[in-house]
Amino acid sequence: MAPRKAKVQKEEVQVQLGPQVRDGEIVFGVAHIYASFNDTFVHVTDLSGRETIARVTGGMKVKADRDEASPYAAMLAAQDVAEKCKTLGITALHIKLRATGGNKTKTPGPGAQSALRALARSSMKIGRIEDVTPIPSDSTRRKGGRRGRRL
């Protein structure tokens, strides 16, 4: 009879979703905040912008359609995103703020300010803040006709 072979114990590899970092090291992500007058999106990616880390909208946080773009819904969305980022090890964010743009309004919606404040207050460090609203050099004709929108 052949001698028994000793059982080899396999080492369990712990899988981490976030980046491999030391304690106290600052890891940056990019928060894309799109604030229109109908909804607010808070979308966090890695620095390249390819990998989505978390994406929450104002509409996911409130029941009524009229409240989707409200500052309160944007604040809840930003707090959710910050919580997810912390669990994955992201401690700091660069912010790219965007309004509708194009041939529509270039003003960010009501949720932009409160989303940014909520990210800052949830102990996330803020790096650069940039406005990435698409502004045309020469646009197509805006809706409303020759005489404009009549109220």
UniProtKB/Swiss-Prot annotation:
Bias (Basic residues): 142-151
Listed GO CC annotations: cytosolic ribosome; cytosolic small ribosomal subunit
Top-level taxon: Eukaryota
Tagged with keyword Acetylation: no
PROSITE patterns in the record: RIBOSOMAL_S11
Keywords tagged on the record: Ribonucleoprotein, Ribosomal protein
Region of interest called Disordered, as start-end residue ranges on this chain: 131-151
MF (Gene Ontology): structural constituent of ribosome
InterPro entries: Ribosomal_uS11, Ribosomal_uS11_CS, Ribosomal_uS11_sf
Pfam families in the record: Ribosomal_S11
GO process terms (BP): cytoplasmic translation; ribosomal small subunit assembly; translation
Family: Belongs to the universal ribosomal protein uS11 family.
Protein name per its UniProtKB record: Small ribosomal subunit protein uS11A
Species name: Drosophila melanogaster (Fruit fly)
